[in-house]
Every structure is written in C-alpha cells, then in structure tokens.
Amino acid sequence: IKGNDGGSSVTALTIDMSAAGAATFNSTVTENSDERLKSNIHTIDNALNMVGDMRGVYFTKDGVAGTGVIAQEMEKVLPEVVKENDEFKSVAYGQVVGVLIEAIKELKKEVETLKEAS
C-alpha cells in the first residue's frame, strides 16, 4: 500500500492476516494524535478509580491463549473505547493509554505524599 491521505503516510506496508483475524504488520501502526485535530481537550480525572474498575484477564480465543479485557466490562468503565460491529464488540486498546498514564501520575503523587509524611 502506498499513499498519503493527509493524516497518515504509508510507503510500504505488509499485513499478514490469520484465519482467526489476527493481523501482523511489518511496521508500526499509529493513530493520528495531533492537537490540531482535537477539540475540548482536558486532563482525565479519577483515572486511578477507572483503572481499579478494570479487570485484566487471561483467556483462550480460537485455541490461542491471550491477555486483555472483556469489552462488555470495559463498556461500564470507559464506554468510548468499546466499538461494535454487526456481531461482536471490540476494544480500542490504544485509547486506554491516556487513562493509564493519568492513573500512574495519581499513584506517583500518592507515593510522594507518603514519603513526605514519613
């Protein structure tokens, strides 16, 4: 695939698809994140509580072991990361990163407060 759609530039890309629907790319997959494309930008609050409400799971899908989350559970915590097609729900894992970053920062603040108190 070659092209430039104004937001992503691809010069050479190989995608290997498995029968189970897994895709392997020979390059990095990125998502547009330019500030100029976004509006209503604000920091995520209560991220640590959100992470506390998430459940990481081990599972087997199509005979292959994996780790992740359950879309129906994530929908209750962070509905904007759950997508649905005709049959199944999926999770945009990359969109969870902002919550994880802010949760780590909240933990860091708590650790610093505890260190100062001791």
Segments and roles (model prediction):
Residues A23-G94, L107-S118:
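C-terminal intramolecular chaperone/autoprocessing and neck/assembly modules of extracellular spikes
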Residues I1-T11, A19-A20, E31-E35, P79-E80:
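Right-handed beta-helix
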